[in-house]
A protein has these predicted regions:
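Substrate-binding pocket helix/loop in short-chain dehydrogenase/reductase
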Residues: 4, 32-33, 40-42, 130
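Catalytic Tyr-X3-Lys loop
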Residues: 19, 27, 34-53, 68, ...
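A short, exposed helix-loop element centered on a Lys and neighboring polar residues
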Residues: 56-57, 103
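Alpha-helical segment proximal to the catalytic Tyr-Lys
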Residues: 61, 107-108, 158
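Catalytic loop of short-chain dehydrogenase/reductase
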Residues: 72-97, 102-103, 107-111, 123
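Short, small/polar-rich loop/turn modules that mediate ligand/substrate recognition or access, typified
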Residues: 110, 115, 160-162
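A conserved structural motif in NAD(P)-dependent oxidoreductases
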Residues: 134-145, 156
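Short C-terminal tail/terminal secondary-structure segment
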Residues: 161-176
Length: 176
């Protein structure tokens, strides 16, 4: 919590009140859930769920006071479909928690001029991605995610809250 407070204090001293918040955090634990230490499990949960909660907890009061704000959380495309892999269980469970938190926060702030939504990619193109497995011959690009983010932050999405857009190239509906 102290690190989040320091971050917000720094941003607010340089830029003013936070009225747009994008929670893009993630920690993996690519190991079978039974083989994980409790400490690693908690670290993945803290990075994915707690950090999102703490940043929202810090940003929402000022957004409520301003009667305007935009929050976009980053989830995982498999969460809505119940995709779970025992070899990375804490990540899947944590990102599902982020989506549930998104919906709860959207309901709680709906009368305050704040929208809360989520973007959920499957795989974003990195050097670790395997293009031969990708739908449409490629994984999602950062530009694919930015397009959805820009929509959520635009006036066109003023009445959109509590939603999740999966950016998966149609891959997950085929696999679940």
């Amino acid at each position: 919590a102290e690190a989040v407070d320091r971050l917000f204090d720094s941003v607010e001293s340089e830029l003013g009140t936070v009225d747009v918040l994008v929670n893009n955090v993630g920690a993996f634990a690519p190991s079978h859930w039974e083989a994980l230490s409790v400490e690693r499990w908690r670290e993945v949960m803290a990075t994915n769920v707690d950090a999102t909660y703490l940043c929202c907890r810090r940003a929402v009061p000022a957004m409520r006071e301003a009667e305007w704000g935009r929050i976009v959380n980053v989830g995982y495309a498999g969460s809505e479909k119940g995709l779970v892999n025992p070899k990375n269980a804490p990540y899947f469970i944590a990102k599902t928690g982020v989506l549930l938190f998104t919906r709860m926060l959207a309901a709680d702030t709906t009368d305050d001029g704040i929208t809360v939504n989520a973007i959920s990619p499957y795989v974003v193109d990195t050097s670790d991605a395997f293009p031969e497995d990708a739908p449409r011959g490629r994984w999602a690009s950062v530009d694919d995610l930015v397009a959805v983010l820009e929509f959520f932050l635009s006036a066109a999405a003023e009445y959109v809250s509590g939603e999740n857009v999966e950016v998966d190239g149609g891959y997950l509906p085929e696999t679940v």
